[in-house]
From Swiss-Prot:
It comes from Chelativorans sp. (strain BNC1). One of its GO terms (cellular component) is plasma membrane. This is Elongation factor 4. Keywords: Cell inner membrane, Cell membrane, GTP-binding, Hydrolase, Membrane, Nucleotide-binding, Protein biosynthesis. Coiled coil: none annotated. InterPro entries: EF-4 (IPR006297), EFG_III/V (IPR035647), EFG_V-like (IPR000640), EFTu-like_2 (IPR004161), G_TR_CS (IPR031157), LepA_C_sf (IPR038363), LepA_CTD (IPR013842), LepA_IV (IPR035654). Its main location: membrane. It is found in: Cell inner membrane. Required for accurate and efficient protein synthesis under certain stress conditions. May act as a fidelity factor of the translation reaction, by catalyzing a one-codon backward translocation of tRNAs on improperly translocated ribosomes. Back-translocation proceeds from a post-translocation (POST) complex to a pre-translocation (PRE) complex, thus giving elongation factor G a second chance to translocate the tRNAs correctly. Binds to ribosomes in a GTP-dependent manner. It comes from the Bacteria. It is a peripheral membrane protein. Belongs to the TRAFAC class translation factor GTPase superfamily. Classic translation factor GTPase family. LepA subfamily. It catalyses: GTP + H2O = GDP + phosphate + H(+). GO terms for biological process: positive regulation of translation.
Amino acid sequence: MPRMTNTPIKNIRNFAIVAHIDHGKSTLADRLIQMTGSLEEREMKEQVLDSMDIERERGITIKANTVRLEYDARDGEHYVLNLIDTPGHVDFAYEVSRSLAACESSLLVVDASQGVEAQTLANVYQAIDNNHEIVPVLNKVDLPAAEPERVKAQIEDVIGLDASDAIPISAKTGVGVDEVLEAIVMRLPPPHEGDASAPLKALLVDSWYDAYLGVIVLVRIIDGVLKKGQTVRMMGTGARYPVDRVGVMTPKMVMVESLGPGEIGFITASIKEVADTRVGDTITEDKRATAAALPGFKPAQPVVFCGLFPVDAADFEDLRAAVGKLRLNDASFSYEMETSAALGFGFRCGFLGLLHLEIIQERLTREFDLDLIATAPSVVYRMNLTDGKTVELHNPADMPDPVKIAEIEEPWIRATILTPDEHLGGILKLCQDRRGVQADLSYAGSRAMLVYDLPLNEVVFDFYDRLKSISRGYASFDYHLTDYREGDLVKMSILVNDEPVDALSMLVHRSQAERRGRAMCEKLKELIPQHMFKIPIQAAIGGRIIARETISALRKDVTAKCYGGDVTRKRKLLEKQKEGKKKMRQFGKVEIPQEAFIQALKMGD
């Protein structure tokens, strides 16, 4: 049983690790856990804190995780270190923001061979906004390509942090990790003095669903003491719950009697779903409530929407159960039912960004064994109607009659791109092609930092992939939503055999409608098999056709049985065939194979 709750507040350290993807923060967390003996050797595995298989395989952290480490420092004191591991990817920025709000300080991990990247910047600025004390750590110094001095200079130039006493380490081999532990104790501040006798005030940092214990809530105690058996109240929702268990993560769950000021731990109460626990809410005791709630976080707003449909209509109920379960664990993922003429029943789902979308899709296929079709991702548009109302549009198929629309506004983002300067030309061209507006360009050594305003609609498809291919994988990219701006947007419908296919309709900028329409028609021409009659494939804006391709008909050689003889006989047979084809075209249904949908929707450009 860990030594509990009697730790003096001056011996507690709450810290987060911030870094760009792949700079080694989960590996450093593994080493810290190993060196403080929180897990026995046999329980250690790579990336202990990345609990989902998908996190381990992709080598990314998605959910923020927490662990309590006990450390006997060189000064003879016994310390409790609460580490919160944060995701590095831009889609999970809100996971980072709430992790940082629960701590007083951060370790900034920078790869000594790669240097500062765009997400390093974004996360460090968040840490600075939270008034964090930051200790820079240079990881991977054992690599032949490591240039610690250059990277130190870069940290000072780009971020403006003093890196003269940055700690050189190799998280993989464990070199220098003991210095990190000492720096945490010596250079990072303890939590602000809390009052143990005051009414309970705790920040709800995170919550997730466990099949046995129900919802587990991660809390950071500010004032007061949280004990088993107390009745607590969520100040945001007003819901009351009796506390069943109190514990800490070491990363295993260890039950304790109580948690005091400055500590981070978890509670379980009979809470049925994660949606009942709002992240950033204040938890207090029901009988003796605290006067003021803590300033909360703004809830994560879904930014990208797409339809998810089962390939086999019989799997719809399984899909319903699966999205419900994912929602239990991920409150930022939203969904509602929708139907499509082409694809049947499914769900319209909202995500924080493209990586989030990809991961949810992958989890549905993997954990729940479902075959899915995803429609083209779209963003949330605002329609200002002529009668003065404003409506939000999540699905292009639901767009109101163009006559009723006064203007359409689309979301814009502020993107920060860091790239080696030899790729700058290609990236500038990419941003301009995507209707970007340059806001800033500066240099730090041989790297350029570009700031662009871009419409989110242009980034959603394949911007990231294109950026990586232009820069040979060296550019990094980070963005946040800024505002909505009016845009000359039109709804492009795809017609197959004069029938609109709702799953393929999309909102595009007028200047790009023709290019996108032509590309889509060409793609469908390759994908839809020939029928017995001619099939036109058209892209249209309203009633105006902007692109067309035709799939020619399969035809039987009806004149094969005529040997010589009169030409009018042949003509009669051909005329008869022509009539039949005409009739067939009128009544024939075009079967669009599922594969064609999947391929056509993958098309970014």
